[in-house]
Amino acid sequence: MSYQEHEKTIQEISNYIEQHLKDDLPLQTLAKHAGYSRFHFHRMFKKVIKKSVVDYIRERRMIQAAKDLIHTDQRAIDIALQYRFSS
């Protein structure tokens, strides 16, 4: 598979992550969606996105939670729990 094909696959997975930020996103599930082993998926994701999968998901959840804090009347604890941040 060429780098461009890997890049396209990882972009599709990052879109999937964006749509499911409030859901559990285990590495194994994401790798399966990409059609890669966990190891290969983790390696390719980091190569394309320049961050580990876990760091990327955490960052995207933080950004979305911050937007929700600004633009909604939801309590901070409710937003934190929606985006899977624990106390």
Describe each PLM feature range.
Residues 1-5:
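Inter-domain helical "communication" segments and dimerization helices
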Residues 27-35:
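Hydrophobic, proline/glycine-rich low-complexity stretches
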Residues 33, 82-83:
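Residues within the alpha-helical elements of helix-turn-helix
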Residues 37-38, 86-87:
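Short coil turns linking two alpha-helices in DNA-binding domains
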Residues 7, 11-28, 47-82:
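Terminal helix-turn-helix DNA-binding modules in bacterial transcription factors
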